Amino acid sequence: MDGWRRMPRWGLLLLLWGSCTFGLPTDTTTFKRIFLKRMPSIRESLKERGVDMARLGPEWSQPMKRLTLGNTTSSVILTNYMDTQYYGEIGIGTPPQTFKVVFDTGSSNVWVPSSKCSRLYTACVYHKLFDASDSSSYKHNGTELTLRYSTGTVSGFLSQDIITVGGITVTQMFGEVTEMPALPFMLAEFDGVVGMGFIEQAIGRVTPIFDNIISQGVLKEDVFSFYYNRDSENSQSLGGQIVLGGSDPQHYEGNFHYINLIKTGVWQIQMKGVSVGSSTLLCEDGCLALVDTGASYISGSTSSIEKLMEALGAKKRLFDYVVKCNEGPTLPDISFHLGGKEYTLTSADYVFQESYSSKKLCTLAIHAMDIPPPTGPTWALGATFIRKFYTEFDRRNNRIGFALAR
């Protein structure tokens, strides 16, 4: 493969850097770490099982969902989690019940499957379930919660309990899910989701978990940062890590370059162009870009991605764009113009060979995704981008910082 990445069949294992499940117990004065594992995405799992993605229909690639709480409904852009590849662990209750979760800057609520989920829902059988009767700190709320995904409805009710994340304990309102569609969640290696977004995105305006952590005053800074390991060949490597309260200089080099958010309430910034090689091809007049840790790929509007793929010579195959693998190393660089600086991805960063696919075709980690107003139209910079650029989310100053990952 001439040094460029191969998508692993099964994800990276956690490198054990201490005895604590949720963080380093000795790290009490600076910041807290959450170690991440890498997993096969739901889409990868479906392909490995020979599922014809075309038969599932286009709704499987759509990003728009509606969230409902009680009698209130609001449109919120959420990752569909079909391509999510990284998860960490949290504990809920006293004593803690451990769950694998996606940490998602594109949403703001916490939810996990509930022991009250009927075994008729196969997805619940395959996941860890929260049992309120086993927690001495549990408090009942009961407000109905529904997340309407394009692939099915996830619903349940709100509860309150102590959540342990990165060695920090916080009293948190979260969703206990009692109804989950078998597809896609039966194939997900993660149990639930921890939203790292703003309260403006939270259904029912439930205070997000990071806001509650900030209010405790236990962090050095009101920031959190993401590192995704690019060493996908080494199964013993750390899949990645989240740092609460700062950034880890072991995983980036140089200084951070900061870009202010478009507005408070969403992790979205201004982009001034997308270049292929030396030519600015897209977004010449400016556009928006979400920085989305819940997504694996980079995405843009259908019209933008079609133009980009034409320039790259890529062909569409179901929901993916592919090239001949021997052409991959010759593809041009793609640069994203953010805050007066170009962030460049080489073909090694955005082309990969799927272990279950023909060796003659390789997939581009770039997808089309049409996000409607008011958040869209917008690009979304997911793990494809974050693997190359260590990313810091600064709540105090409403900005995002990037530094070259190492």
From Swiss-Prot:
Q: Does the keyword Disulfide bond apply?
A: yes
One GO term (biological process): response to immobilization stress
Spell out the catalytic residues. D104, D292
Disulphide bonds annotated for this chain are C117-C124, C283-C287, C325-C362
Please state the Enzyme Commission number of this protein: 3.4.23.15
Under InterPro entries, the record lists: Aspartic_peptidase_A1, Aspartic_peptidase_AS, Aspartic_peptidase_N, PEPTIDASE_A1, Peptidase_aspartic_dom_sf, Renin-like_dom
Look at the named UniProt entry and state the broad enzyme category this protein falls under: hydrolase
Q: Which reaction does it catalyse?
A: Cleavage of Leu-|-Xaa bond in angiotensinogen to generate angiotensin I
What keywords tag this UniProt record?
A: Aspartyl protease, Cleavage on pair of basic residues, Disease variant, Disulfide bond, Glycoprotein, Hydrolase, Membrane, Protease, Secreted, Signal, Zymogen
Subcellular location, in the record's words? Answer: Secreted; Membrane
Please give the activity regulation comment for this entry.
Interaction with ATP6AP2 results in a 5-fold increased efficiency in angiotensinogen processing.
- Family stated for the protein in its record: Belongs to the peptidase A1 family.
Associated condition reads: Renal tubular dysgenesis: Autosomal recessive severe disorder of renal tubular development characterized by persistent fetal anuria and perinatal death, probably due to pulmonary hypoplasia from early-onset oligohydramnios (the Potter phenotype).
Q: Sum up the protein's function in the record's words.
A: Renin is a highly specific endopeptidase, whose only known function is to generate angiotensin I from angiotensinogen in the plasma, initiating a cascade of reactions that produce an elevation of blood pressure and increased sodium retention by the kidney.
Quaternary structure annotation from Swiss-Prot or TrEMBL: Interacts with ATP6AP2.
Protein name according to UniProt: Renin
Which species is this record about?
Answer: Homo sapiens (Human)
Gene behind this chain? REN
